[in-house]
Regions:
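Short, Lys/Arg-rich flexible segments
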Residues: 1-79, 91-135
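Aromatic/pi-system hotspot detector in well-structured domains
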Residues: 87
Length: 135
């Protein structure tokens, strides 16, 4: 069977498009999976007294942007304006009686940083696994 150069180019282009689509879909699945796992990691590192549970319930995974080649998911606080507490809890803050040194500073409860580190470490690994699974 012989092919003209145009037919060969068209066949190669079609094959590359299919492979590109397969890899993109696998990467999107990996991003979604990693975002859900990251949310759990952040919640596991809540070491403060979350009396009402509003802070924990407000932590969500949301899709910031998605098209055929790209997806951006973020783990953040969407409900009840709980995002206002994140910086204060993560880094501590000055108390009413003044000062930024102990005992006049509220204790820091880092929790978001663990999620960031987890996502940075796991995302490439999850992408590789999803691509291998989709073959």
């Amino acid at each position: 069977m012989s092919m003209s150069p145009d037919e060969m180019a068209e066949a190669l282009q079609h094959a590359f498009q299919q492979e590109s689509q397969r890899v993109n879909e696998a990467a999107k699945r990996a991003v979604k999976k990693t975002a859900k796992e990251t949310r759990k990691v952040v919640q596991e590192h809540f070491t403060f007294n979350n009396r009402s549970g509003k802070y924990a319930r407000a932590l969500t995974v949301s899709t910031e942007y998605e098209d055929s080649f790209d997806i951006r998911q973020i783990v953040n606080f969407k409900k009840n304006k709980q995002y206002l507490l994140t910086h204060l809890l993560e880094y501590g803050h000055a108390m009413k009686r003044g000062g930024r040194t102990l005992p006049f500073k509220a204790k820091a409860y880092p929790h978001m940083i663990y999620g960031q580190e987890y996502a940075e470490e796991k995302l490439p690994e999850n992408i590789r696994k999803e691509i291998e699974k989709s073959k």
